[in-house]
From Swiss-Prot:
It is an enzyme of class 5 (isomerase). It catalyses: uridine(38/39/40) in tRNA = pseudouridine(38/39/40) in tRNA. It comes from Shewanella amazonensis (strain ATCC BAA-1098 / SB2B). Substrate binds at residue 109. Homodimer. Keywords: Isomerase, tRNA processing. It comes from the Bacteria. Belongs to the tRNA pseudouridine synthase TruA family. Gene3D superfamilies: Pseudouridine synthase I, catalytic domain, C-terminal subdomain, Pseudouridine synthase I, catalytic domain, N-terminal subdomain. This is tRNA pseudouridine synthase A. One of its GO terms (biological process) is tRNA pseudouridine synthesis.
Length: 261
């Protein structure tokens, strides 16, 4: 039997999603809890591997099991065995042709900036603090150059292992909510550090350090060294993964917190 789960987590205390020897990971904690409930070893596949310090409100995983359990066992039961900063939001059986990663048609991230002269005391691990006068409209306008299928070499990590630098960005917006700025971006998939590298460069435009057309210039350059420094991990959230409607997966509010969908 194949089961799909929707999970959320605060990535502050984890060395990323992926299971690694001798460090704490979201995958290892989830597999440990699932294995207890299933009474057999469980391995999970996820929609998107998040880095150290990065959060998720809409991560999707699947696993195969011989165990027959009520739906509540895969939600309430698993949550009992998870640390407080990981939670299962929903669970449902799926066909064997469903794959959390390969069946996905889009991923959506939100990057939350706390724009204030002083650092935050609350949510300090859930937002990234940047001071200065940030022009959100400039950031939004500049970001539109990213839409479409593009070569994102300038925005991929040096150690990125993807076979191709091309990704298709479906939509991107930058908006202000009081002291908070939200960069919201959806694409078919993302390169390693792609969102944080994009945000780092957009911030340079918002601060007036680079011209409005700089994002287009960076796309043409195809050179990571020409773009800005990688933005901090704390403000980044995987908020949604899109699948064909035929799979019938639940759609919940994106978040984080009270942010509208």
């Amino acid at each position: 039997m194949r089961i799909a789960l929707g999970i959320e987590y605060d990535g502050s205390k984890f060395y990323g999603w992926q299971r690694q020897a001798e460090v704490n990971s979201v995958q290892a904690e989830l597999e440990r809890a699932l294995s207890i409930v299933a009474n057999e070893p469980i391995e999970v596949q996820c929609a998107g591997r998040t880095d150290a310090g990065v959060h998720a409100t809409g991560q999707v995983v699947h696993f195969d099991t011989n165990a027959v359990r009520k739906e509540g066992a895969w939600t309430l039961g698993v949550n009992v065995h998870l640390p407080d900063d990981i939670a299962v939001r929903w669970a449902m059986p799926v066909n064997d042709d469903f794959h959390a990663r390969f069946s996905a048609t889009a991923r959506r991230y939100r990057y939350v900036i706390f724009n204030h002269n002083f650092r935050p005391g609350i949510l300090r691990k859930g937002v990234s603090h940047y001071h200065g006068d940030i022009d959100v409209e400039r950031m939004h306008d500049a970001a539109q150059a990213l839409i479409g299928e593009r070569d994102f070499t300038s925005f991929r990590a040096i150690g990125c292992q993807s076979n191709t630098p091309f990704r298709n960005v479906h939509k991107v917006s930058v908006s202000r909510h009081g002291m908070y700025i939200v960069v919201d971006i959806q694409a078919n998939a993302f390169l390693h550090h792609m969102v944080r590298n994009i945000v780092g460069s957009l911030l340079e435009i918002g601060l007036g350090n680079q011209p409005l057309d700089w994002m287009a210039t960076l796309l043409e350059a195809k050179d990571r060294s020409q773009a800005a420094a990688t933005a901090k991990p704390h403000g980044l959230y995987l908020v949604d993964v899109t699948y064909p409607e035929s799979f019938g997966l639940p759609k919940l509010s994106l978040g984080p917190l009270f942010m509208p969908d």
